[in-house]
């Protein structure tokens, strides 16, 4: 049995928990689809999820996490901020754009109030340099995972 476990492993598990307490959640349009009766049963819910995962999530969310991680590993804060700006400008739905920004700012706020041993200063540099911008959740997450 291990007596000493790296605390950062638990933090990584915690931030990947769907119930991570960032005090904000969002349906990302599912509510509207239900209200308009476009998602009304198991089959239409499956199609909605499949479409969302194979388009928006894959080419926007996952790609931005990957790019933020890569830029952070190269200490390229300007590149990270550029990804945030591109994401903010490319989300056509105001509702989804604001959700991403709120999730990002609350994610950052929660992490800053947590005692974390970072392996580098990339996340804290990103937070300081993105104060005048609107950080997105996926970019903040990617930079945090690299840090």
Locate each region found by the language model.
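Membrane-interface "cap" regions at the ends of multi-pass membrane proteins
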Residues: 2-9
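Acidic-enriched, low-complexity/disordered segments with a strong bias for Aspartate over Glutamate
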Residues: 6, 17, 41-43, 84, ...
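Glycine/small-residue-rich interface belts in oligomeric ring/scaffold proteins
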Residues: 10-77
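Internal, conserved structured core segments that host functional sites
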Residues: 62, 67, 74-146
């Amino acid at each position: 049995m291990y007596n000493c476990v790296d605390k950062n492993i638990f933090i990584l598990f915690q931030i990947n928990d769907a119930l991570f307490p960032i005090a904000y959640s969002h349906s990302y349009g599912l509510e509207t689809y239900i209200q308009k009766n476009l998602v009304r049963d198991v089959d239409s819910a499956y199609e909605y999820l499949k479409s969302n995962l194979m388009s928006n999530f894959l080419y926007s969310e996952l790609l931005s996490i990957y790019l933020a991680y890569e830029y952070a590993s190269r200490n390229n804060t300007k590149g990270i901020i550029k990804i945030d700006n591109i994401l903010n400008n490319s989300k056509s739905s105001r509702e989804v754009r604001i959700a991403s920004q709120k999730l990002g700012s609350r994610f950052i706020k929660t992490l800053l109030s947590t005692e974390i041993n970072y392996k580098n200063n990339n996340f804290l540099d990103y937070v300081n340099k993105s104060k005048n911008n609107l950080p997105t959740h996926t970019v903040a997450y990617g930079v945090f995972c690299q840090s």
